[in-house]
Amino acid sequence: MPFTPSDNTDQQFSPDGKGVVHSLIIPVYRNEENVPDLLQALEELGRNIPAFEVVFVVDGSPDRSAEALAEGLARATYAWQLIELSRNFGSFAAIRQGLALASGRQFAVIAADLQEPPHLVEEFFYRLDKGDVDLVVGVRASRNDPPVTKFLSRLYWRMYRTLIMREIPPGGVDVFGCNWAFREALMSLEERDSFLIGQLFWLGFRRGEVTYERRARTVGKSAWKLRRRWRHMLDSVFAFSDLPISVLLWLGALGTLVAVTATFILMAAWLSGLIQVRGYVPIMLAVMFFGSMLVFGQGIIGCYVWRVAENTKKRPLSVILSHRHGPALMLRSESPPPTSELP
């Protein structure tokens, strides 16, 4: 759907961000090969979206993503910011940093790999400009990923929706758009090792959805390796649920019941003379079972305690290494509603 602004007055962009209304945040990590196609797609968006800026956040990428962006942005016709973080803090921290520094009044977030079609950004701003929603999320109708990846993703999100947060769409969420009010509420949640998608739905507000088909990756390789996926899964669970501790509690209660029952049975057997020699194997099995359960339980509790400790340190969620701005550019004549009409 083509984007249509709600007002028509001349607007000038200045380096301090005055005049920017629509900000697109793009986290960048190992996307050097995607940069040419990405910049070309953004040029097309810039022609369709008024008062538009793009905020690139290079999340400690080990390749030449930052250099490639700097070279390409020298010829960009839209307003832009290029932020480099001092190391890899994770995509969620990069997105937050981009939201914090964006100059607009409405915001959208997409990935740099172009697996989400860029026209989603126009859809997000169209819905936000209507004023009936505060948050718009992209919902995958289908995804062109390897079968194993699709199966594991479907299984994970189904379990997450069933056990932890039912509001999240069945296929999960990777991209979203929001207005100023929602952005301010989101930025107030200064939690380390949290789950950004969970925060979006935990906050509430008026939500809308835009359905799309996730495209196959044609350039480069995904940086979401097994270790990152595992950490992402742990953060998504421990940040929004006490389910692991509840399961541990029920396992402990069940183990206690079994132990008490076994005690009465063994005492009755011993008094009746059925047990002549104490068995080595049952004792060892019991010790190993309950010992491993104890260690497992301590690990679960430790995950929660560690997250509490991390949040008490008050360290910044990310550190900026460099921050560059695009030149002052004349944007399209269309303008958003006056500031007084925005949240």
Where does each model-flagged region fall?
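Structured catalytic core of nucleotide-sugar glycosyltransferases
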Residues: 2-145
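Hydrophobic helical membrane-anchoring modules
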Residues: 2-21, 195-343
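Residues in soluble alpha-helical coiled-coils and helical-bundle/repeat scaffolds
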Residues: 29-33, 115, 119, 187, ...
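Residue-level recognition of specific faces of alpha-helices
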Residues: 41, 54, 88-91, 106, ...
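Residue-level signature of catalytic and energy-coupling elements of molecular machines
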Residues: 42, 98, 113, 136, ...
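Solvent-exposed polar/charged
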Residues: 47, 74, 100, 126, ...
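Acceptor/aglycone-binding surface of glycosyltransferases and processive sugar-polymer synthases
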Residues: 83-87, 91-101, 118-194, 215-234
